[in-house]
């Protein structure tokens, strides 16, 4: 089960131009976003550790996204 709230995920789809969004579509996008987010976060943690830090910074996230 996805940890992301469903309502904001539905709004993302609506902001992309969909007049209506099914529950299945919201659930599917939430799952994909969560999987992508976990992958990016894991890479950001590696970058922070490599830099000798325990704290993940925004720059780590940005670098992880570019590396993906």
Curated annotation (Swiss-Prot):
* SUPFAM superfamilies on file: Histone-fold (SSF47113)
Gene3D superfamilies the UniProt entry points to = Histone, subunit A (1.10.20.10)
The principal localisation class reads cytoplasm
At which residues is there a site annotated Interaction with DNA? 14
Q: Which domain of life is it from?
A: Archaea
Determine if Iron is one of this entry's keywords: no
Task: Output the InterPro entries linked to this UniProt entry.
Answer: Archaeal_histone_HMF, CBFA_NFYB_domain, Histone-fold, HmfB-like
Name the UniProt key words of this record, in alphabetical order.
Chromosome, Cytoplasm, DNA-binding
Q: Which residues are connected by disulfide bridges in this protein?
A: none
Query: Which residues does the annotated region (Interaction with DNA) include?
Result: 20-22, 54-57
Asked if the record carries the keyword Thylakoid, the reply is: no
Record localization: Cytoplasm; Chromosome
A single GO molecular-function term is:
DNA binding
Annotated Gene Ontology cellular components are: chromosome; cytoplasm
Can you state the subunit structure given in the record? Answer: Homodimer or heterodimer with another histone. Dimers then assemble into higher oligomers, with the DNA wrapped around the protein core.
Q: What does this protein do?
A: Binds and compact DNA (95 to 150 base pairs) to form nucleosome-like structures that contain positive DNA supercoils. Increases the resistance of DNA to thermal denaturation (in vitro).
The record's annotation in PANTHER family points to:
ARCHAEAL HISTONE A
Q: Which family does it belong to?
A: Belongs to the archaeal histone HMF family.
Task: Give the protein's recorded name.
Answer: Archaeal histone A1
> What is the source species?
Methanobacterium formicicum
